[in-house]
Amino acid sequence: WDEDHIPDQQSGMVNDSKSIEHSDTDSAKLVNTKEVNGEKHHIYELNFGCIGNNSVRVNYKLNGEDKFTQFEFNVLDKLSSTIETHSDFVATQTQDNDTSSPTYGIYSDWYFASGKDSTQRSHWGDDWSHDNINFMAMKNYLDPKASEVESIEEYLVDFMWNSYMKNSHDTFAVANYLSDSGIYGGGANPYSRTYSEVMEATGFFNMYRIEKAYPNLINYRKSAEWYLEKAYGIYSNRVSASPIGFYGEQQIPDMIEALYAEGLTDEGDNLKVLFA
């Protein structure tokens, strides 16, 4: 563990105060009835048997006619538990681990009803799976788990750099859709959106920070500097302040400091010019 690079673990960084304990069974208990301006208000205590979406239907009569009102509650577990559960699910369930697959290493989109997205070749982009790497990398920078960091390596090295971006190593373009990527396309400048490229750049940068903070966590396949170079390459070639406003810019000061720390002074100066 490298104390100089481990992020501050502030108490309260993950706020569990809004979570509730769910019971084994659903229940509704009338606890009080109040009359306000001539109207009766019945107050119930609700216990939900599962996390996620819960529907509550209240049946009543109005002027002798049957009526109902339906409420929708999204019940959360503790946020810390939810984050851990989600990162484990992304790594163990959504990632393509078939080494013979063209999308080996991808974090696929997932639907509750049908599982992995079977149409991701045409639907994949800045509004879809590009954001999964941001969650996984930042979570493991703050709370590392060896198997998940190995999963991130598989995504960034095998999938993103070696396959998805294989035709754009010089341009650093990140295709917005899977169908236009190096896996299925041949161009060095595929259709892209800056939002997609920022997501991948921050994924690479946070992997750099993971390796700097926890150098002995796993046997890393690439150096920390390798990931920093990819993050810088995307930002310097594909991103600027004008088209996306403040999207993703919160990490640029940290990236500039990292470039200087690694002796990449010209690169750090260049990002300053681009985003000052």
What is each model feature region?
Residues 2-82:
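Extended acidic/polar, glycine-enriched regions
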